[in-house]
């Protein structure tokens, strides 16, 4: 099974997993990615994030805590998936790219910036809708 088949839903739309302690973050991401990806929300703090993501095989993951970012990074590196860490406290975005964290914004962790980071990662990876 190729990466595109594994990371897209049955409709061919890429799957994005949001692992968050805040349901409003998942709602904001879902609204921002409407028409681009299917978004599924999962509660943070379950302790098995990397294994869960391996089973789910999303094209991208959005998390909102350093602990979940670290756990999801293990999956993202293995699967070459896009990983965006949204720091709500610091109003900042980080993107895991080529195995390293890059700061995307300071002072603007808006849904639009999250959309841009996720969409760019998905399309650069070759998963198309």
Segments predicted by a language model, with ranges:
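Internal alpha/beta domain cores that form substrate/cofactor-binding pockets in large enzymes
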Residues: 2, 13-56, 60-128
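Extreme N-terminal leader/targeting regions
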Residues: 1-4, 8-9
């Amino acid at each position: 099974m190729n990466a595109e088949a594994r990371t897209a839903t049955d409709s061919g739309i890429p799957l994005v997993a949001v692992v968050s302690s805040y349901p409003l973050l998942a709602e904001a991401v879902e609204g921002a990615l409407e028409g681009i990806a299917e978004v599924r929300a999962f509660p943070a703090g379950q302790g098995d994030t990397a294994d869960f993501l391996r089973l789910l095989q999303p094209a991208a993951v959005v998390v909102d805590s350093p602990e979940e970012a670290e756990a999801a990074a293990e999956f993202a590196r293995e699967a070459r998936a896009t990983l965006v860490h949204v720091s709500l406290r610091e109003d900042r975005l980080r993107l895991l790219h080529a195995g390293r964290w890059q700061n995307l914004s300071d002072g603007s962790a808006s849904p639009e910036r999250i959309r841009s980071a996720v969409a760019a990662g998905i399309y650069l990876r070759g998963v198309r809708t």
